[in-house]
């Protein structure tokens, strides 16, 4: 995943690669989207912002159909693997992500064959994501087999980067005696791109005619890992509260279900806009009073929603609709930037929304704290410095071994 893809992993990998290209020779092997965001065909090879990019053969079948998604994963991973066997050299540091899920395994083989060091960034922990989203049955042979494979993977790589404490625990259990290779490095907030905007000046709220409403927003992926059903159940219970509007912005497997429910239940307090381009983030993330960020209970440790950091940058309080043990909920509670509610209890969410609406002064204080975190603890400078230290560790270790 890499530019011009706009998904979170592609964005973060692009920014990291371009940063390290200032100090090292950086090359990227990735899938090949047909067009960029402006409809311009994407070249197979290019040198962009200091990075050599080679886009491999890819399949673009509908990823919402599971069989097609598997085919896409296989084609993309095989293509990158074959290129990696040629492009990777002895002594290289290779950085790989967990999407698609097969990619880390084929990259590990390529690195072992070519004598390179491998750094694994975990965005999603498998097979836990598959179990939580209902793709695999817990306790099934396939789940146990995938757990075994991932244990081998985690013990074969030289560093593991995880996005939160819950993920570190889960990955640590699989890494076993190699758990000392794990480093917690969260995603960053784009505080220079996303910044607070007065509600009455927000163009999206003006366009929708809801500047005078208390707006509860959920932006991002509307997929199997999100407790969208709980959010809709809460919205239905608040249907008679005419001053509260729910604004959904995003895409994913549950979009058709959402549209159907809005029609069937006449949920006039819900506005669904679909996906918006990343460059419009500042407008749409500021189009609310409070932001909902959600994960299913089984997703604790299996993923951390990157959207939360730019919600902070927009100075918006968060209602975490997720397990209390998730990184999302831990940050929300520890930093006092919002509320934590159960992803299985719409009544709890209703109560929290009404509490938030009744104390706008507290909302403002939470928003200020969230923005400060985005500018400091979760700034791009702070997070990239963590990657720099981790890479320096690897280089020092390698030099030490050479001198023995």
Residue spans of the language-model regions?
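N-terminal subdomain of nucleotide-sugar transferases
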Residues: 1-49, 399, 403-404
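Carbohydrate-associated surface elements
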Residues: 32, 166, 188
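A short helix/loop element that forms part of the nucleotide-sugar donor recognition site in Leloir-type
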Residues: 41-46, 195-209
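Membrane-proximal helix-turn-helix segments that form the acceptor-binding/catalytic region
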Residues: 85, 102-105, 109-113, 126, ...
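Conserved donor-binding/catalytic core segment of Leloir-type glycosyltransferases
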Residues: 210-226, 232-235, 247
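A short, well-ordered alpha-helix in the C-terminal region of glycosyltransferases
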Residues: 213, 348, 355, 362-376, ...
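Nucleotide-activated donor-binding/catalytic signature segment of Leloir-type glycosyltransferases, i.e.
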Residues: 239, 243, 249-250, 255-282
